[in-house]
């Protein structure tokens, strides 16, 4: 399709879906699993009207169904609820100061270290309730190393979110390399990849997780999800004055908006090519472990392609015009929001 647009008011999304050759799969239990939206709202009273809007338009159920297509209903529900609370944490830390992010981290990590035995407190932070409920259900079936990996990677998310908050308070603009390193933590993708193990009932040995090729595959999948997200979320984030990879390139390298978007698109394509090359370089650890590794790598691919398609199904990035924009790839630039 030939796309013609007024580049002063619009930009063109790169066709990442066509370049990504991974098949899109969907969990057959999608409709049987209850709504994560209702779960989060019911377990987390007192959210602001703006937060409720974001939760309701997220559609974590579809994302979980695309990214964890092989699990049963119970595990799909846990995965969907995890994604719902994770996106909520991402939203609220985007505007928090460092101290607030640190307090939030303490609340969540307290729940995630609890082994499901936390007593309710009268003064308990509201977000602790859904976090505690989620963790209690997760550890019923999650193997020990998978629990540790998810918890450690949530801790990494908060560590980098605190660093991001500190930079935001100080008006620091990161260079591209520094931003990419931070984004690998703030994306929280590695915790989602731990859920891949959980969803299919495997537990990769630590020596496999530490293997350089497996590490490279994890990093590439993380980058692919993060960079496509930065492209798709750019319009909303620029309107609210939030920096992402596009803005970093525009300010640090003097690129125009469309050139910056195309730059990230090129990085995406190079990275997916590298991912495919690395899948052919995996060593062998014996038939049983190799079979689990194949399932895990398939799960990384499910995450990459699932995130691409979900980005147009959710109303988070393009409102109710997702299907239209998926077809045309033309996005009208939103006006800047006034600073409150």
UniProtKB/Swiss-Prot annotation:
Reactions performed catalytically: (2E,6E)-farnesyl diphosphate = delta-cadinene + diphosphate; (2E,6E)-farnesyl diphosphate = bicyclogermacrene + diphosphate
Query: GO biological process: any one?
Result: isoprenoid biosynthetic process
Summarize where Mg(2+) 1 binds, as residue positions: 90
Give binding positions for (2E,6E)-farnesyl diphosphate. 316-317
Per its UniProt record, the required cofactor names are: Mg(2+)
* Top-tier EC class: lyase
Q: Where in this protein would one find the motif NSE/DTE motif, according to its record?
A: 229-237
EC number per UniProt = 4.2.3.-, 4.2.3.100
Residue numbers for the site described as Plays a critical role in the stabilization of intermediate cation? 87
Q: Where is this motif: DDXXD motif?
A: 90-94
Keyword annotations: Lyase, Magnesium, Metal-binding
Annotated Mg(2+) 3 binding lies at 229, 233, 237
Q: Which family does it belong to?
A: Belongs to the terpene synthase family.
Q: Which PANTHER family match?
A: BETA-PINACENE SYNTHASE-RELATED (PTHR35201:SF4), TERPENE SYNTHASE (PTHR35201)
Domain note for this entry? The conserved DDXXD and NSE/DTE motifs are important for the catalytic activity, presumably through binding to Mg(2+).
This chain belongs to the protein called Sesquiterpene synthase 6
Species name? Postia placenta (strain ATCC 44394 / Madison 698-R)
Q: What is the lineage of its organism?
A: Eukaryota, Fungi, Dikarya, Basidiomycota, Agaricomycotina
